């Protein structure tokens, strides 16, 4: 292990922001970039009249709807650390892509709209984080508006999300009467002022909760604050770093992202407390981040990031060693060596050629159709990183096209979108129509829009009489062949070449499983493993 690699790994922080739609996640992403100096002016999210859109929302459909459909990656430096921020789709229909992004991070920042509390998507995403004991920092947003009682919010997080809360800051008032926050650990009060788009100035700080200046500044609120703090300190958990790193306790911050207030404290907590890159599981062994040899896995493929170029980028999380431009690395699934000369790093949709990268960094590899989600790369060692699943889709549509002459473009478009993970594509063993599977309706809208804009294909989706899909496998090849022959009408091949059973209803699936006890029906499948 070289000292250089060890030092670089210690400097890295890789995290994702998770939230329910409209909790303020994209705004917070912008402000984190603003505070770090990565951008000079924040784009206003959903600024339809101004024509200005958020740096991290770049696909046409996102611009129309003001939601983060694709996950962007942004790298910036802050306080002698390199931060990799992964923006996840906030819309509830995009849980599968979001899940895959969460396999590539070491910690997460959970944003909660303090007027609404814990919402459905937040619950789903936190459950995904819990599978890997990911440390979570919590930000209660929108205190410049009327919000719910802060103690109630903490109780709700603990009850519903089953994670203990340790408030680090505490709000003074809300809405028009929002005065600032008290930093419990530092015994300091940060005074609120509405912040604009430009780089924020320092907020005024008053030292000590018993400072006489507070009586002059806000005589009505100060006694209530002191009473609340006494109550919070008696009833809440103290911050404990080990419990945070184990994913058992979340530090909670309060503020207003749109006003740049509370952002600095979050950034500092991620630098000071969140873990550096951790070892990763592969099929053969655990891979340490400070090992000398380069390795990594693909967690996402994005088609056409630049509408001017019909390119696809495969997003790779570096797991160990040092990546250097021009180095030879092996694409292990197809056993092919590639020269990594045009690999890129990200600042949202701005791309720069990557000269070097270390564990925790995200790099983009141009993909001409050979790379799939879950693929592993190394300097030669046969590694297959695990923990990147596909989920059984819940909604299905069959696809037709208005212009039969464009069938090739349709097939190419769906193949690319299937590999990217935007939608799951199944080719039935009998019948000509392709079947699309998704976790939510919006995914079909995205596919319709992208087929039209990127491949020039007008597609029509019809409802398909399918209830669910299960990937099937069997060690006994003879039994599998019998199963295929008997159930040809319900079988399809997915974009990864795996056999799937498309069940018309729950009863049918149950009966089929009973009839064929030797066949294994899988609700998820690993990206890197062929069933």
UniProtKB/Swiss-Prot annotation:
Which compartments does it reside in?
Cytoplasm
Question: Listed GO molecular functions?
Answer: GTP binding; GTPase activity; translation release factor activity, codon nonspecific; translation release factor activity, codon specific
| Similarity comment: family membership | Belongs to the TRAFAC class translation factor GTPase superfamily. Classic translation factor GTPase family. PrfC subfamily.
Any GO BP annotation: regulation of translational termination
Chain sites annotated for binding GTP: 19-26, 87-91, 141-144
In terms of superkingdom, the source organism counts as Bacteria
**What GO cellular component term, any one, is given?**
cytosol
Function of the protein:
Increases the formation of ribosomal termination complexes and stimulates activities of RF-1 and RF-2. It binds guanine nucleotides and has strong preference for UGA stop codons. It may interact directly with the ribosome. The stimulation of RF-1 and RF-2 is significantly reduced by GTP and GDP, but not by GMP.
Name where it mostly resides: cytoplasm
Q: What is this protein called?
A: Peptide chain release factor 3
Q: What PROSITE patterns does the entry give?
A: G_TR_1, G_TR_2
**What are the UniProt keywords, alphabetically?**
Cytoplasm, GTP-binding, Nucleotide-binding, Protein biosynthesis
Say if the entry is tagged with keyword Transcription: no
**Which part of the chain is the tr-type G domain?**
10-278
